[in-house]
Amino acid sequence: SYIEAIGGREKLSMVKSIIERSEASMQGATIEVISQKNNKRQAITELKMMGNVMQKQVVNKDKAFMEMQGQKIDFEGQTLKDMIQIAALFPELNFDLNSVEFKGIVDVDDKKAYEIKISETKSNFYDTSTFYKIQTIQTQEIMGNSQTSTVKFGDFKQVNGIYFPHTTTLSMGPQAIDFKSTGIELNTTIDASLFE
């Protein structure tokens, strides 16, 4: 299974926090993404360009919001549920097997993958040979508009005995952005005020 493939339940349950940093280039500018999560259902993802925070997504237990260009948007409904789920350090540890649905084996680029529908708006895809999660497809309602995003994961490497993807490709519509990991830290203390 995926949990065993990336390190095993025992190792994963010892992780208290994850800080991930990655970078991408878009139209000549460098985009930096900093994601910080703890084991209390709190997570923050900041998107920075030239040192300035362009967008911020925060999950704080049972609430989630996005800040963009000075505007704060609270997430609701299924999008809120999905945000809370992915705020977990390793969401797969918490899956309710009665509520996920196996959809079949599909092609993801040049790989065969198991498609698992985990909610009304989100599916995960796991490589049939390695069991790594190689893709997610999610539909979000933002300000009345429905947006579908595809995230692909690759270049899996160990950090403290746990495998993490070190490349991530985010696609929304015709645009795709390739992010490369610049650092992953486990069990670093995260300032609780970030989630307010």
Functional labels for PLM-detected ranges:
Residues 60-122, 140-148, 194-196:
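Flexible, processing/modification-adjacent segments and terminal tails
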